[in-house]
């Protein structure tokens, strides 16, 4: 290693090499306001029952009175058989689950031995070891291609036929797209009149509108990328490249008006959808996400939409509040010097847990977390700074209220670090916290009427439905590090970039018998957990239904599973050292390398559409970049406008002002004026001004996942 390489290696461990290392972004007043909001609900007002009875009068308890049940009356099931059989049935099922868990561990051990001594032997084993030694994607790609050549996977790429996509349609469409694109380019090059060019361009646009759709003809089926270590079918790659060229031809066509181009790209964007990076929870296992993000960033495939839950929310906040240049300097082992949430000793933890029921101090975590969020930055401010859309999943402390996905649309003025804390507030580890909102004067105030929130992983670790609702996301890239889920990850037919080597990719991991037993045991475990939940037999430690940490969906179209080691469980609530973080960065990058080509092909079309959409959008200047543009003007949400209109300081003084406002505001104002006298309306506005201000903060909150769709499902049935 020469001197420049040694210097670079030393820099990545030097804390002074990362930007803003010594800077404290948060204002002490913000922490003080947060502490007041936390303690506000804990104080009891001193109220006497009457003038003759003292405050807090001691009353002897009636020993014969029945104890109040932990659950409310509506939750507690009744019936003789339920009361008698509940606990025996619960113990029997838990005993059977324990037996299944032991059998599952033996099955996985058998599969590991089978793959080690049967599947991986000889030269392919040495090639695989060489593959996993690579820390750079280009070198990894060369090693992957060498392994594909040895296994004969290159011949598989050259054969168009495959059961998991419609190769006949794709082959025919590639020829049509190429012919239409060539005709348009030839006519534009020869200077043909617009009457001749426009019909050819319309034909090309019609072809694009018919094929630019999510997973059209199965070209985005993960199975197409699960038969080789690098790449996919040559026909699929040719189709993706041709679609990108056709989109660029339409975008550069001077005979088509900008308005028509905008509507065309808007249509393509709606049909094709968006890509999002979803970072799971998992305590300190979440630091593997840093490596995943670094691999995507270095290869130019980091999505603009990012969501995080629990520990993943901290990583997502760092990514969404920094530019690409800042991230390249931050995602290094030296970042471990800024991760100081668990620096206290064991004695402090035990004393705090005994006093408060939580292992960590909320204010300390808020101070440390604020550095990753650039102080009291809001979701809207982060979007305006970097162009990335941050989403954080939070669960209300009330077990029956729906979850929330906080982002710049649903809660634009919510402070990011408060949402990250709420998403990481696991019962027993961190007490539920209050979300904070930034007011116009820069001070902080409680959000959502002071309700408290806790760990989002308990119910919505990967909020796919909410992402689809808000941002049309239909291609989630999930980085999954939850330790209780990683233990059960097993792809019997291979995964993206990791094919089954047994019988040249057409076999089963561990043989058919091993894969069949593994699938049966895993499905049986899932079945009994669902039985316990639906029969309401599970107890609720710490007032929380814990069944969802097993039964929710934890995967996406692409799921990245960083490989953990046993020592990670020992350090699950400890700050990483630079050496441990360096290993986690390396493992995270290596786990993402097999997915890079699949993500590149997806974003190749998506970015071409977005580029044309932003270039010809009437609301955005063509010179503005998506990452560097801000939002000028007022929000266009009709609900926000209606609530703003009802505030006393926003009322129009004359008809001209009323006509300048949106049509929705005019209709609401005119309707209200017909229903109420003017004096009553003024009195009502004065008395409810504070309520409308709070409602305005909460106006765009949309709730997430199963609770959102439960009512619709009932209506359909």
Curated annotation (Swiss-Prot):
Primary enzyme class: hydrolase
PNPLA domain segment(s): 277-468
Membrane topology, from the record: Single-pass membrane protein
InterPro entries, alphabetized: Acyl_Trfase/lysoPLipase, NTE, PNPLA_dom, Triacylglycerol_lipase_N
Region (Disordered): 620-696
SUPFAM superfamilies, A to Z: FabD/lysophospholipase-like
Enzyme Commission identifier(s): 3.1.1.-
Biased composition (Low complexity): 660-673
GO biological process, one term: cellular detoxification
Pfam families reported in the protein's UniProt record: DUF3336, Patatin
Active site residues according to the UniProt entry: 310, 455
Biased composition (Basic and acidic residues): 639-658
Highest rank taxon of the organism: Eukaryota
Function: Probable lipid hydrolase.
Protein's UniProt name: Patatin-like phospholipase domain-containing protein AO090003000839
Lineage start: Eukaryota, Fungi, Dikarya, Ascomycota, Pezizomycotina
